[in-house]
Curated annotation (Swiss-Prot):
Protein's name in the database: UPF0352 protein YejL
Pfam families xref list: DUF1414 (PF07208)
HAMAP family (alphabetical): UPF0352 (MF_00816)
Family of this protein: Belongs to the UPF0352 family.
């Protein structure tokens, strides 16, 4: 998802590291991790975005997620 951001790479990487640490601490398998992260995204949209903008934000997030996934990347 390369685009200009108002957040530093360092800040983003630290948050990502912290979130991954929590998932690892709880030994969450991939399906549970995705379920929890999806619920977190839903909660953020429903509690922090105006109702009139929620669908547009969800669509934008979905497009960004899909564009960041490459089928040829090994896991």
């Amino acid at each position: 998802m390369p685009q200009l951001s108002r957040y530093s790479d360092e800040h983003v990487e630290q948050l990502l590291s912290d979130l991954l640490s929590v998932l690892e601490k709880h030994k969450a398998p991939t399906d549970l991790s995705l379920m929890v992260l999806g619920n977190m995204v839903t909660n953020l949209i429903n509690t922090s975005v105006a109702p009139a903008q929620r669908q547009a934000i969800a669509n934008s997030f979905t497009r960004a997620l899909q564009s960041s996934i490459s089928e040829d990347k090994a896991h």
